A protein has these predicted regions:
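Substrate-binding/catalytic subdomain of NAD(P)-dependent oxidoreductase enzymes
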Residues: 179-258, 277-298, 303-305
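A conserved regulatory-domain signal marking ACT and ACT-like small-molecule sensing domains
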Residues: 274, 331, 336-454
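N-terminal glycine-/serine-/threonine-rich beta1-alpha1-beta2 phosphate-ribose binding loop
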Residues: 1-97
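Rossmann-fold NAD(P)-binding glycine/threonine-rich loop
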Residues: 87-97, 106-144
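A short hydrophobic/small-residue beta-strand
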Residues: 100-102, 400
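General beta-strand structural signal in soluble alpha/beta enzymes
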Residues: 62-63, 78-79, 102-104, 127-131, ...
Length: 454
């Protein structure tokens, strides 16, 4: 057996505590699978007096980040403090000191992946990040290794457990958005400020990472078209169910090379190429109406799932807990085992992530992405309103697939919900139509719309 692999853990909160526990409680198993001992040498924390797992020897705990990074007995630095400021400095300093890095920091990779990976290549060291996307679901390894013979043509994923918990509660228990969010916060699925979860930002960070691995595309999270779940009303849940659909917050990537059938026609949601002939990939995070029979429609609660389409293998699904102490720790320790075996070093060198050697894809402009749309309007109940709306849609070459309008109350006078499902249309044209509809003066509230997943 070769020398011990020394580990410094920077951050020992929920996930860091889980990593320390797994390394110490299952040391024999991990040694067997890594082919060498994985020894926890340092644990860096903000508050050394905070109670910790009794398996962590007190002498390992300190507040000295630099001491941990430059300790000659440390070969790997595990960054689990999150965010961009201190975490980025820790990662770059560790690489400069000749240490491998394991991180679960999606924001760091999505925003500064190019800088981090260039530093790793200069230092001839490895960055592992399985836990940065979908927690305990091994989708990074699947894309980088198991599907290496494929060109991924599309990804559809539920990457935020908080949003999926809220939508599940609304669909299955008839809860309002506000009530479902409050329950998610009470159970610890949502933060006191849930903005990053419910507005799609968290999922956009993760999609940016998946897009880099799958297509070689470097897309900043703010460059990804994004729509959150906070505009979804109980009315939308009911109408979707009536139409045979469930609403899910999806992170999606579509290439022009991916098509699917609907009503016997082959359709592509992403453009084939840009003006220079370079193939494009459409990236967006938004609520999507999925048929009840779709695989992702059946993912419940706080679980994550990633559906990957490869040009050789076809459709593969990866599902499991997307967050939490032990699921995330499982992925972090798996990266450490890969480093111990030497597998991670070989795959890192071959992958060339966040480098100039991309795979020839560019990001599709959001307005060119094609979709069917669900449109809900609160309209005044008087003659001519529907005719005005359909005329505007026709002006933008948007045809109607179906329409749902329940009878108005007997007293009349108040707005009534009108739901329109369109055929495929370009997002830019659809948004122009919405702007005109909202200016008609016959709607009681701004239009609500979502993409259809078929």
């Amino acid at each position: 057996m070769s020398d011990t692999l020394g580990i410094a853990l920077v951050g020992c909160g929920t996930v860091g505590g889980g990593v320390a526990h797994v390394l110490l409680a299952h040391a024999d198993r991990i040694t067997q699978r890594a082919g060498r001992a994985l020894a926890l040498r340092r644990v860096v924390v903000r508050d050394p007096n905070k109670p910790r797992d009794p398996l962590i020897a007190p002498e390992l705990i300190s507040t000295d980040i630099a001491g941990a990074i430059h300790d000659p007995a440390v070969h790997v630095v595990v960054e689990l403090i999150g965010g961009l400021g201190v975490a980025k400095r820790v990662v770059l300093d560790a690489l400069a000191a000749g240490k491998h890095v394991v991180t679960a920091n999606k924001a760091l990779l999505a925003d500064a992946g190019a800088e981090v990976f260039e530093a790793a290549r200069r230092a001839e060291r490895t960055v592992c990040f399985e836990a940065a996307v979908a927690g305990g679901v091994p989708v990074i390894r699947a894309l980088g290794e198991s599907l290496a013979a494929n060109q991924v043509t599309a990804i559809q994923a539920i990457l935020n457990g908080t949003s999926n918990f809220i939508l599940t509660a609304m669909a299955e228990r008839g809860m309002s958005y506000a009530a479902a969010l409050a329950e998610a916060q009470r159970l610890g699925y949502a933060e006191a400020d849930p903005t990053l979860d419910v507005d799609g930002s968290d999922a956009a960070h993760k999609l940016a990472i998946l897009a880099q691995i799958s297509f070689g595309v470097t897309a900043k999270p703010h460059e990804i078209a994004r729509q959150g779940i906070d505009t979804i009303d109980a009315l939308d849940i009911r109408f979707a169910n009536e139409l045979g659909y469930t609403i899910k917050l999806l992170a999606e990537a579509w290439t022009g090379g991916h098509s699917h059938s609907t009503n016997g026609a082959k359709l592509s949601r992403g453009g084939a190429a840009d003006a220079t002939g370079t193939p494009t990939v459409a990236l967006h995070v938004a609520p999507v109406l999925l048929r009840h029979t779709d695989l992702l429609a059946q993912v419940r609660g706080a679980y994550n799932a990633v559906l990957v389409y490869g040009d050789i293998v076809g459709e593969t699904l990866y599902q499991g807990p997307g967050a939490g102490q032990m699921p995330t720790a499982s992925s972090v320790v798996a990266d450490l085992i890969d480093l111990g075996v030497g597998r991670a070093q070989r795959t890192f060198a071959a992958a060339k992530l966040w480098s100039r050697e991309g795979r020839g894809f560019t990001v599709e402009p959001p307005e060119r992405v094609r979709s069917r749309f669900y449109l809900r309007l609160q309209v005044t109940d008087k003659p001519g309103v529907l005719a005005d709306i359909t005329r505007i849609l026709a002006d933008e070459e948007i045809s109607i697939s179906s329409l749902v309008q329940h009878e108005a109350q007997e007293d009349g006078g108040g707005p009534v919900p009108l739901v329109i499902v369109t055929h495929y249309a370009a997002t830019g044209r659809f948004r122009r139509a919405l702007e005109r509809i909202n200016k008609l003066g016959t709607t009681a509230a701004p239009a609500v719309f979502f993409s259809m997943g078929d």
